[in-house]
Amino acid sequence: MSVRTLPLLFLNLGGEMLYVLDQRLRAQNIPGDKARKVLNDIISTMFNRKFTEELFKPQELYSKKALRTVYDRLAHASIMRLNQASMDKLYDLMTMAFKYQVLLCPRPKDVLLVTFNHLDSIKGFIQDSPTIIHQVDETFRQLTEIYGSLSAGEFQLIRQTLLIFFQDLHIRVSTFLKDKVQNSNGRFVLPVSGPVPWGIEVPGVIRVFNDKGDEVKRMEFRHGGDYVAAHKEGSFELYGDRVLKLGTNMYSASRPVETHMSATSKNSASRAQENIAPNPLAKEELNFLARLIGGMEIKKPSGPEPGFRLNLFTTDEEEEHAALSRPEELSYEVISIQATQDQQRSEELARIMEEFEMTEQPERNTSKGDDLLAMMDRL
């Protein structure tokens, strides 16, 4: 497992979340000023300096449930509210989109180009906010600094770590089904056409070399596909042609997107013990979430500003039906964490929590550990 996977996972899933929210904000005719505020607030929180400092520290991936909690907090960083069914659908769309992109990356290193495509599109949402653009550019700089010198083997390990994280997710997405890139069982269709990875020859020739490295024989074979050579490599600079289209906004055509549980996904969920049994890493995940969420400096509006509810379904009835029909094993509504009273750890977490503005409820006279668990209950 690579300890450099988390930033790529978080940024790409966050980019997909913004694509979906932007599409739904437009579909529901939310006023432009409110829609811009929602996206600006979420992006500003997502690229907050303290948050990214914690994010880029070498660390292993945690459970889907722990990461889901972070995105739930992130999606509600502004005046917009999502109910449980819409949040479930949002997370399903995010994860399946990025899983598809990781599967189709021509080279393991190209997951970095996918990330840059997301960052490029995110900057398009905040063109009138130079301060937030600077935050995104600073994250780009961190990415190039950390990942620019990694070997092909290290990128392969990152890709394998991502695929292991996604391996039990087989949720059907209407866009993928219509484009015939996903089967009815929720599994993706790998193409046998298109450009090969940069620097790789089109398949069809086998060369045999002797012990001196000289070619002594050449044979041709039919590969059964329709491959072409890549005309150029995507740019890894701040500005440039990424060439690769994976990670761009697939909702720009403004078509409704639906998700459905496949039988495979339901069966996988029933076997996923992390959702129904106590998590042995609960204490570590609590610390992880406290550090990440503690870095989310969410700014509440100074004056009274009415919020609104966003529905990721066409109608309220569909949303209610989705909430009732979703398998219980796939619910992320409750995270149960049992933390022991370790004095040094409690003091450290309490210090982190002091940096996190809690304005929803008045402070109560409780212990530091209880304050932290109460915060987790309110997520």
Curated annotation (Swiss-Prot):
<keyword id="KW-1003">Cell membrane</keyword>
<dbReference type="GO" id="GO:0022857">
    <property type="term" value="F:transmembrane transporter activity"/>
</dbReference>
<dbReference type="GO" id="GO:0005737">
    <property type="term" value="C:cytoplasm"/>
</dbReference>
<dbReference type="GO" id="GO:0009925">
    <property type="term" value="C:basal plasma membrane"/>
</dbReference>
<keyword id="KW-0472">Membrane</keyword>
<protein>
    <recommendedName>
        <fullName>Protein OSCP1</fullName>
    </recommendedName>
</protein>
<dbReference type="InterPro" id="IPR019332">
    <property type="entry name" value="OSCP1"/>
</dbReference>
<dbReference type="Pfam" id="PF10188">
    <property type="entry name" value="Oscp1"/>
</dbReference>
<dbReference type="GO" id="GO:1990961">
    <property type="term" value="P:xenobiotic detoxification by transmembrane export across the plasma membrane"/>
</dbReference>
<comment type="function">
    <text>May be involved in drug clearance in the placenta.</text>
</comment>
<dbReference type="GO" id="GO:0005886">
    <property type="term" value="C:plasma membrane"/>
</dbReference>
<keyword id="KW-0813">Transport</keyword>
